[in-house]
């Protein structure tokens, strides 16, 4: 929620832009805070509402994609959409999005550090993303945006 609010604030890179939220039906609960944190006029909620081919067509129309290591992240990258891939401790150099229009943000904590924490729950992969900071993702997003914008005008 904080990342989207930062990036869509007045004067920021996605100010006045709409945000599309993609995911499967079983991801609705985890996505609701993000959806509820955006004004209805700025949110396109596609959680569980579209087939993979429809989602692919929607992603193709996006001007930017930020998401975890997933099939949708790879679809965005393959379509040429500027893509920020979010990674826990898995190796982004192996599984990250490819291309000049892509960048990965990786957890600052190793896999062994993350699984050794008291609150680690092996039934949830959410714990593996806790080492990602909003600041790091915002910085990477702004850098990629500036790089893409610069290459388009130059």
Model-derived regions: residue spans:
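Short, functionally important structural connectors and interaction interfaces within domains
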Residues: 42, 87-90, 97, 120-124
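Gly/Pro- and small hydrophobic-enriched strand-loop and loop-to-helix capping segments
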Residues: 79-107
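Flexible, glycine-rich phosphate/dinucleotide-binding loops
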Residues: 28-29, 52, 92-93, 104, ...
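Leloir-type glycosyltransferase catalytic cores
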Residues: 100-154
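A structural signal for well-ordered alpha-helical scaffolds and beta->alpha junctions
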Residues: 27-28, 88, 98, 130, ...
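Donor-binding and catalytic core of enzymes assembling or modifying cell-surface/extracellular glycoconjugates
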Residues: 1-88
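Short, charged, surface-exposed secondary-structure boundary motifs
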Residues: 54-56, 94-95, 113-117
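Glycine-rich loops and low-complexity Gly/Arg-rich segments
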Residues: 44-47, 70-71, 90-93, 108-112, ...
């Amino acid at each position: 929620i904080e990342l989207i609010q930062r990036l869509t604030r007045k004067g920021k890179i996605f100010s006045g832009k709409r945000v599309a939220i993609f995911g499967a039906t079983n991801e609705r609960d985890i996505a609701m805070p993000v959806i509820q944190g955006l004004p209805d006029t700025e949110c396109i909620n596609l959680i569980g509402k579209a087939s993979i081919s429809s989602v692919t067509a929607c992603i193709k129309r996006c001007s930017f994609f930020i998401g975890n290591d997933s099939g949708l992240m790879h679809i965005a990258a393959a379509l040429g959409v500027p893509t920020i891939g979010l990674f826990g401790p898995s190796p982004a150099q192996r599984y990250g999005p490819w291309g000049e229009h892509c960048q990965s943000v990786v957890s600052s904590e190793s896999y062994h550090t993350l699984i050794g924490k008291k609150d680690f729950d092996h039934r949830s992969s959410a714990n593996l993303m806790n080492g990602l900071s909003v600041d790091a993702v915002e910085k990477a997003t702004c850098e990629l945006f500036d790089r893409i914008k610069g290459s388009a005008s130059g």
